[in-house]
């Protein structure tokens, strides 16, 4: 581990030199690349330097064990014990930091929420989840922007797509991808029976232009008049935009803005994120196939969480987390779930790293 840490520290120094080079500073793409790598290594280097400093202090304190004064020798023993505990803690921190990280963790994210089985009740719950993530983003100090939405007559969402802008947004929200099941009594249910509905959530890392090149000739652009609930026209100009990526068949529609240009820019951002996600999923599937292990393949087909209103319960089925604070969670209090899932998947990554 320590040979690797020395290499990381050496590379960190090289990057600091490169980022101070005027030729790199004037090359936007190169500077961004080096800056990202520098940021990824910063925490590791900081922990390693603290580890070395503590080790040096232990050695200095050991010299005091030979002191003639018994009181100084006793103080030295206590100090060494404290420093060893600190070094052990830093050792664990370094092991975690050296575990392979998701390169997308610090990126902005695109969140797609779609009503599934359950009709109108599913669309209402899609709106509940949208509000939940929106409020969580507010508590984290992140900015949000709706890219596209399809509203039902009752105020629910058939589909809503929005961006979340903020450092660490992807690392906090990426485990939300999957099927979210809700169990509750609809307001229109006279018999008081509990209905089960489902909503799908997809969380995609924002793709930067330098990461993913899209040939303009491979995109088909269609424009049309935007429509609201029930199909009524909400604009008299052809402001809605539909982009089709011909090689993959991925289609994106944006019609929320009155400006065709704004809709096209939003659609391109969504398209780029979906294509990057598709590329990542393909890579994960190849890795999983090579290992003969589907863990981490990115399969979203399974139910990941249940929201049970009669019991006031939220259960995440992957990590086995159950919380009896449903209303609080739906108001954006996701920290306990997010932290629990991060710990669970970190342990899974450590298992995979040890096995490889």
From Swiss-Prot:
Main subcellular localisation: cytoplasm
Alphabetically ordered keywords of this record: Cytoplasm, Methylation, Protein biosynthesis
Database matches in InterPro entries: PCRF, Pep_chain_release_fac_I, Pep_chain_release_fac_I_sf, Prokaryotic/Mito_RF, RF-1
Modification sites for N5-methylglutamine: 232
Post-translational modification: Methylated by PrmC. Methylation increases the termination efficiency of RF1.
Cell compartments where the protein resides: Cytoplasm
Pfam families the UniProt entry points to: PCRF, RF-1
Signal sequence, renumbered to the chain: none
Coiled-coil residue spans: none
GO cellular component assignments: cytoplasm
GO MF: translation release factor activity, codon specific
SMART domains tied to this protein: PCRF
Chain spans, region Disordered: 286-307
Task of the protein: Peptide chain release factor 1 directs the termination of translation in response to the peptide chain termination codons UAG and UAA.
Matches recorded under HAMAP family: Rel_fac_1
Family the UniProt entry places it in: Belongs to the prokaryotic/mitochondrial release factor family.
Stated name of the protein: Peptide chain release factor 1
